[in-house]
Amino acid sequence: MSRHIQYSIVVPVYNEELVIHETYQRLKEVMDQTKENYELLFVNDGSKDRSIEILREHSLIDPRVKIIDFSRNFGHQIAITAGMDYAQGNAIVVIDADLQDPPELILEMIEKWKEGYEVVYAVRTKRKGETFFKKQTAAMFYRLLSGMTDIDIPIDTGDFRLMDRKVCDEMKRLKEKNPFVRGLVSWVGFKQTAVEYVRDERLAGETKYPLKKMLKLSMDGITTFSHKPLKLASYAGILMSGTGFLYMFIVLYLKLFTDSTITGWSSLIVIQLLFSGIVLLILGVIGEYIGRIYDEAKDRPLYIVQKSYGIENKRLYRDQHMS
């Protein structure tokens, strides 16, 4: 059955009742142009609105619509991972439900795939309808990731991309409890290329990636693919120790060889507060890594599916190959 489906379109959904019908219509119009078999795999990530009801209505009419319904909100990256677990196509496309990423670009991705590329990712050349603050924080996010991680993650890319079946299969072998999908796709390698596009403003609803979630995603990406924060913590410790010893020698020299002495508590308190802040920052960095090690050690399931619609293989590929 799996090889009879050429394309799987994975769509994570969280509170998208205002746009989900339009998303389905545009995806259907685009994929019908391929003249090949496809599936639209929606992953409902614990939506609290009518998203699941609207999706169910479409699945009853169109058998190509398949739904994974989480027991609660597990997060965008995990929803993408679940979609890849259940996808049956020879090529898998990940696209958000908010229509900021144009479904029409999928056809260009498919052409690149047919040319032999195994990963085709979309690069944003412009972002419509976003505030100056949002654009600047997004730019900082991508450049921070690029500078701090040990792999080459393309700048100004999201999770909108096409992956060959063998890329998806390799992704399923990874056991990350805090998956950072775009980083993992870069890590597995294979022949990759880019297509450029202008990102549209939201059709309706609110962004699902406010600053707080962007910071968490950035931390997940950095801690997953880099030891640089730990190295920076070590360098900071060396710098603090060196500064402390230098200050000690200055105080001793002034006391033993001159008539001058350093008086006043203000300078000492400032130095102590500065060093204490750096120590706490270092402990926080170490804590982030320890927390992720703890998540991996618990070995809990990545997500829980309370119900699925149109899915024939009820047992996860991940469970079949990881046991």
Curated annotation (Swiss-Prot):
Its main location: membrane. Its EC number is 2.4.-.-. It is an enzyme of class 2 (transferase). It is found in: Cell membrane. The chain crosses the membrane at residues 232-252, 267-287. One of its GO terms (molecular function) is glycosyltransferase activity. Signal peptide: none annotated. It is a multi-pass membrane protein. The keyword Phosphoprotein does not apply. Keywords: Cell membrane, Glycosyltransferase, Membrane, Transferase, Transmembrane, Transmembrane helix. GO terms for cellular component: plasma membrane. CDD domains: DPM1_like_bac. It holds the Pfam family Glycos_transf_2. Belongs to the glycosyltransferase 2 family. GtrB subfamily. This is Uncharacterized glycosyltransferase YkcC. The lineage of its organism: Bacteria, Bacillati, Bacillota, Bacilli, Bacillales.
